[in-house]
Regions:
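Conserved beta-strand-loop-alpha-helix junction that forms the acyl-donor binding cleft
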Residues: 123-134, 151-155
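Conserved GNAT acetyl-CoA-binding A-motif
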Residues: 114-126
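Extreme N-terminal starter segment of soluble prokaryotic enzymes
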Residues: 1-3
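Hydrophobic secondary-structure block in the mid-to-C-terminal portion of proteins
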Residues: 136-142, 146-157
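Acetyl-CoA-dependent GNAT
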Residues: 6-89, 94-95, 108-109, 113, ...
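A generic structural signal for beta-strand entry/edge sites
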Residues: 83-85, 121, 155
């Protein structure tokens, strides 16, 4: 049975591993998964997950996991930018669960949270070249491109009115 719930602190390493595993496939990383994970950890790629309480929960945000039979199969989060704008973060789903409407279910939970917090707009960044499926998914949800708001030149910024 599929469930979506708030992440527990002891699940952070599992969620990170899931994200690295999916990213490893999406970006066609030729290194061994463990080597790739160690490299990205050393660069602090998922540093926002090291203190979920401060980064998300104490700052009008949320970090959710999707589980199937108590195994984490997906993640999704919202981070506060300001009182009116939140940022969609860490939306990842294992490949074997793609195409089943589960991404939409996660997004509906995140949209509900954003509405409850009275956010007016939601932003995100994604890599259009490597994450084409995610880019198309976000466009179908109503996101549109906006000028980049970070210095990551590989990413495209998107936004939607909630």
């Amino acid at each position: 049975m599929i469930k979506i719930r708030r992440i527990k602190p002891d699940e952070v390493p599992i969620a990170k591993q899931l994200i690295y595993r999916v990213a490893h496939q999406v970006f066609h990383d030729t290194r061994a998964l463990e080597e790739s994970m160690a490299y990205y950890e050393s660069r602090g790629e998922l540093h926002d997950m090291d203190d979920l309480q401060q980064t998300y929960f104490d700052n009008d945000g949320i970090f959710l996991v999707m589980t199937y039979d108590d195994q984490i199969i997906g993640t999704g989060a919202i981070h506060k930018i300001d009182d009116e704008i939140c940022e969609l973060k860490r939306v990842w789903l294992l490949f074997e669960y793609h195409g089943k409407g589960l991404g939409y279910r996660m997004m509906q939970e995140l949209f509900t949270f954003a509405h409850e917090k009275d956010y007016q707009r939601m932003r995100l960044e994604t890599d259009r070249d490597h994450q084409t499926r995610a880019f198309d998914f976000y466009k179908r949800l109503g996101f549109y491109e906006i000028p980049r708001y970070s210095d990551n030149e590989d990413d495209v910024a998107m936004e939607m009115i909630l």
